[in-house]
Amino acid sequence: MTWLKLKKQCSKITLNPFCYVTYSLQTASIVMVFLLLLQAALLVATKSYRSLILAVATVAASLVAEAFFRLTHKEVSEDTWSICIAQGLLTGLLLPNLCSVYATFFLTLFSFMFCKFVFGNFSSSWANCSVLAVAVIYFLDSSCFPQAAVSLADLQSKNPSLHLIQSGTLPILKTDSSLTAFLNENAFSHFGSMIPEGYASFFWDNGSAIPAFRFNLLTIVSSLVIFSFGFADTVIPAVFLFVYAALVRFVSPAFVSGVAFQGDILLALLTGGTLFCAVYLLQWHGSVPTTFWGKVFYGVLAGVAAFFIVGCGTSSVGFVFLVLAMNTISPLIQKTEEELLCSSAVKRLRFRLKGNRD
């Protein structure tokens, strides 16, 4: 937080002994759990009970791992219970519905305990336990993860997402026609443009086997809540999405011999969990830089890495390995931040000491 924001936040005189400049960790984690439970509620509404059971199994595994960690470590913050529930929900939502429930529980339990005991609990860990668990499950049973739905021929066309909709690869809601007509008449017509049928369904539920990738509209609304109320910082997600979208739009056609500068941004953002990753995974507590320019560099690097790891969309595990890759790079960025801040502080101190002598 900048000094100007801090000064504005603390400008009111009250009888309270402390002034909080941001929400507590427990409050932020409870909000995250609530928003993730909305994703689970849509699983119930769409009768995706298998995915819901997997989410329950991963939450149970996360809580068991936390309870065992607390038995062996005395000084553990009480705030981590809500964080454990959030981590369990994230893990379950990132898994396809074909995974075995029993295997998912035990592999998640093993991954979380390994992460806690080897790397440290919560913010002490440089690795995201949720994506680590998904990566372990993927390596042991990659067959349950769906293959990329887009082909090279699709990417060479001008509008791959529309082609997937028209071919039936992406499901269309029964109310899509009326909803599209309503949006065109009341919204897009004022800007002189129209959207074809299928895009409303694309935003609402793209039918992915992985729950975290399905409900893009809910993820967008959730991001507005998280970022508008200051539960998370906007720098890394904003820079990441801008860099990744720009590379998909202008650079990706050169790799697939497609139409120049006509890469499909919607396909890249609305499939493969791009938005979900940007909101919930990419800047997990303790795994990102702390300074503004460190966050900008982290976001740029993540956008470039996503372009080469994830590609142009529809990947089922690309963002899992993206987050793990950024987790390994982030400590180097944080170390550089510390050295630069220390060097800057030493220079200012020497300048002040020299001024006092004069």
Segments from the language model and where they lie:
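Long hydrophobic alpha-helical segments that form multi-pass transmembrane helix bundles
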Residues: 124-220
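Loop-to-transmembrane alpha-helix initiation sites
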Residues: 126-131, 265-274, 295, 312-326
